[in-house]
Amino acid sequence: QRVNRVSIGHSIEGWGTVNDYIRYPAQWNSILPNLKKFHTYAQENKSVDSSLIMCIMSLNYLDFPNALLKMHKEFPSFDFHVEPLHQPRQLRVNGLTRSQLELGLFRLNMVLRELREHITSKLENIKRFYQQSADQGTNQETRTKLIEYCSHMDHVRGINIQNYIPELQLNTQDRKINA
């Protein structure tokens, strides 16, 4: 049999150090060149469809608009598939502070103005998700679980989230809740 079409999905969770933290021990400086190779290959071989797949969670919520813009500029022929993460609870976006949720929504709206309509139309569900998340605000129990999760993962990995995603402002060393 002859294969007429191949679809490849590249699952990433952010751009740069955000992806490195979530996908630890992944290293962006090796991921990006590989994505560029696939992008070139897909452009040269019309029987290959490539897409970027991403789940929005508390750890990449603030970075997603930036990542979206960079993905679109770096890989214009790639399709995008983005969905909000609902489980596990400790990674839900309502573990972020209200100001972080509002900042993420502001950033997303700014980025959507820069993208072509055929891209933004695919992101209507994500825009609604960001708006609803900002409207609902912080869940203190989820925030506590997020801080505990990151503290545990930092301890196990021997790293510190502040070196990867400093704007989350999660003080995992003393587990204080900053809401």
List each model region and its residues:
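Radical SAM/AdoMet-radical enzyme domain recognition
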Residues: Q1-E83
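Eukaryotic endosomal/vacuolar membrane-trafficking regulators centered on PX-domain-mediated PI3P pathways
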Residues: N34, F106-E114
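Flexible glycine/acidic-rich beta-alpha junction loops that bind and position SAM and/or redox cofactors
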Residues: S58-Y61, F78-L108, L123
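Radical SAM enzyme core and accessory elements
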Residues: R113-A179
